Structure formats: structure tokens, C-alpha cells
Amino acid sequence: MARPEAVPQSSHKGEHPWGQAQRAMAGRVLALVLGLLLAGVIAVAPAAAEFSGVDYTLTNQSEQDFHGQDLANTSFAGAVGRRANFAGANLHGAILTQGAFPEADFRGADLGDVLMDKVDFSGADFTGAVLRGVIASGSSFSGAIVTDADFTDALLDRVDQRALCREASGTNPVTGADTRLSLGCP
């Protein structure tokens, strides 16, 4: 017949016998994590601002400066960004659905594969921006500047496409795409 294993005794009255072992293990894990943090093995904060994947849903980002930032896969769904500066920013794969970015600066920004349906881009500047594969149905580009922008494979409402074609010109400096051809202008 097998002998039962010894159960550790607790020094605390009424404590479960395994509680002391769990506390000791938690203490060791905490010490290890603190040691790694102090040694710099675990990065707590990046050296440069990195906002990739941040959720700005339903926030007011008016006049905020995001120029040159990595905002890939970030959500600005329902956000307001009047006169916000996104010049040179990487917004690849971001979500701007139902947002309002009137007079925003997107010069030279990467907006590839962005979901931007039902967005107000009135008066926004897309000079030299890459908008390949965007879904922009129901959006307004009234008065937007699209010189040197690349709209290859973009899904736009026919009304917006025609309006953008009236002002479109140039060649995108990054992709080499002709703006008028990328919009499917006649």
C-alpha cells in the first residue's frame, strides 16, 4: 500500500497548505521580472514615439501633430481630426471609418489599404500620398488636393472620382503612378 505524501504545513493559521508555496513562487517571478526590467531586457517605452495599433476611436484629434509617425493599423474610427497633421505618417491598414478630417494634412502619407468609408476629407491635402487599395465609399473629398497622389485599386464613389479627376495631376514620387491614371480618369 502506498504511503500518502507529506503535505506542507503552513505557518499562517487557517491558510491553505499550498498558499505559502504559491506566495514564494509569485515572489520569485516578480523578482525575475523586476531584474529583467532593470537590466533593460524588457523594453518599457520605445525611444521614439510609436503609436502603431493605438485606438483613437471616437476621440477628438483636431490640430494634433502626427507627422512622420508610425500609425499602421491604428483606429481613428469616428474620430475628428480637423486640421490634424499626418504628413509623412504611416497609416497603412488604419481604420478611419465615419471620421471627420476636414483640412487635414496627409501630404506624403502612406494610406495604403486604409478603410476610410463615410469620412469627411473636405479640403484635406493628399499631395504625394499613397492611397492604394483604400475603401472610401461614401466619403467626401470636396476641395481635397490630390496632386501626385496614387489611388491605384482604390474604391471611390463615382461622384468623388469624377470630382477628383477635375483637379488630379502629377505622378506619385514613391510609387511612380500617374495620379489621373490611378483614379481611372478619362
Walk through the language-model features, giving the residues of each:
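Bacterial N-terminal signal peptides that target proteins for export
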Residues: 10-33
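Tandem repeat scaffolds
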Residues: 27-30, 34-186
